[in-house]
Amino acid sequence: MAAKIKKGDKVVILTGKDKGKKGDVVAVFPKENKALVQGVNMVKRHEKPSQTATGGIVTREAKVHLSNIAIQDPKTGAPTRVGFKTLDDGRKVRFAKASGETIDG
């Protein structure tokens, strides 16, 4: 099945402590059905010191389940569902179902 959310997409968080926040997808983990979104779902990690980095409490992003995020509509900025359509030149592209605007290409 084609990926509805890809690296670099602008997304909106639908549920949880970061509801309504917007960010870019840094990485997608299809086997886990999760994605890493920049600046969202921040957690504190206790890291041991290593030769390259000092230890301490580090704040970083945690993975978010794909069901809790939606693509940001390119036209309105609101969360939208994603559909697929084939263009006249034969390319398969994603489009926002709310506005009909193509997301990639």
From Swiss-Prot:
Pfam families: KOW (PF00467), ribosomal_L24 (PF17136). It comes from the Bacteria. Gene3D superfamilies: 2.30.30.30. GO terms for biological process: translation. The keyword Ubl conjugation does not apply. Keywords: Ribonucleoprotein, Ribosomal protein, RNA-binding, rRNA-binding. One of its GO terms (molecular function) is rRNA binding. GO terms for cellular component: ribonucleoprotein complex; ribosome. Part of the 50S ribosomal subunit. One of two assembly initiator proteins, it binds directly to the 5'-end of the 23S rRNA, where it nucleates assembly of the 50S subunit. One of the proteins that surrounds the polypeptide exit tunnel on the outside of the subunit. HAMAP family: Ribosomal_uL24_B. Belongs to the universal ribosomal protein uL24 family. This is Large ribosomal subunit protein uL24. It comes from Parvibaculum lavamentivorans (strain DS-1 / DSM 13023 / NCIMB 13966). The lineage of its organism: Bacteria, Pseudomonadati, Pseudomonadota, Alphaproteobacteria, Hyphomicrobiales.
